[in-house]
């Protein structure tokens, strides 16, 4: 029986109750078979093209870095059906569920984007869907909650702990432990127990593959850097995967610095966490001196996660990728700028990556560079959050 590698260097693994091991083994074997099955690959490709709208555009910005010698491109995952990159891998996993003969899907969601993507895939492929969501996130992401319900999903608010994404993850895992024989846990990011980090990366890698082809067609060369926000890390690993062997292309992930790293209110475990076991994997983790998990914080619900995917930890450890951070205020400024200068409303998550790209462009305006930001999602879901913040600041 062929197996995938469960670790990325020292990170990853499969730290789960024994009861879930057969379900994870089954998932791994189905994935290996599917990857070798041309009909599966063709169906996945057709769904991505005909239903989700791939390939997504690579848009050159016109105004936002006008006074610099930087050329800044945006990989437009915001244009994907469902509003974010999440749709890519959800369609892949949902097809795997059909192959396994299961009829129910369990999911967790933070910003609601993964929940929406799961709900639409379940509606399309006739699967029963229940989504766990932190009660706090249910409040701050009401449009996405209603979208999920419109598409037939059951949304279950989680009130335990900090009532955010990590608590939703724990509840979803509990549900799966009780119902694994008939239900599949459709994990929303490139984290969690093996084989999820590998499966999610492979079902997101078209982001980087398309970017590479589009960049060669537009500029005749590869970018100097690709930049993506990092919460759990799926949009970033989807962008990075095809560039890992291109040593001249910098890979830059941007974690949420929240109210400032020094305040402790952030979501940057890669640079400011300690290695621990959480959510079925060994990975960097925000924890206190007693080893208890600390609550993460970010203006964007989708980055509000105290850990990170194991491959990102490995890429940092071997020096292949760099990880920066952007504060709430920096992300908000980038959000406003893209709206005003380019007519694009980005997700607050993606705005963190954009903030770092703008920093690179303006810290040396005379430097010629070619940058790509993965615009991982659109900001419709965030307009009420932004409205309230700007009102509080007296800007509107």
From Swiss-Prot:
Chain positions with N6-(pyridoxal phosphate)lysine modification: 86
Cofactor: pyridoxal 5'-phosphate
Annotated keywords: Amino-acid biosynthesis, Aromatic amino acid biosynthesis, Lyase, Pyridoxal phosphate, Tryptophan biosynthesis
Catalytic class of the enzyme: lyase
CDD domains: Trp-synth_B
Molecular functions per Gene Ontology: tryptophan synthase activity
Reactions this protein catalyses: (1S,2R)-1-C-(indol-3-yl)glycerol 3-phosphate + L-serine = D-glyceraldehyde 3-phosphate + L-tryptophan + H2O
UniProt-listed Enzyme Commission number(s): 4.2.1.20
Pathway of action: Amino-acid biosynthesis; L-tryptophan biosynthesis; L-tryptophan from chorismate: step 5/5
Pfam families: PALP
Signal peptide range: none
GO cellular component: cytoplasm
HAMAP family named in the record: Trp_synth_beta
Its job: The beta subunit is responsible for the synthesis of L-tryptophan from indole and L-serine.
Family per similarity comment: Belongs to the TrpB family.
Self-association and partners: Tetramer of two alpha and two beta chains.
Protein name: Tryptophan synthase beta chain
Organism of provenance: Francisella tularensis subsp. holarctica (strain LVS)
Name of the encoding gene: trpB
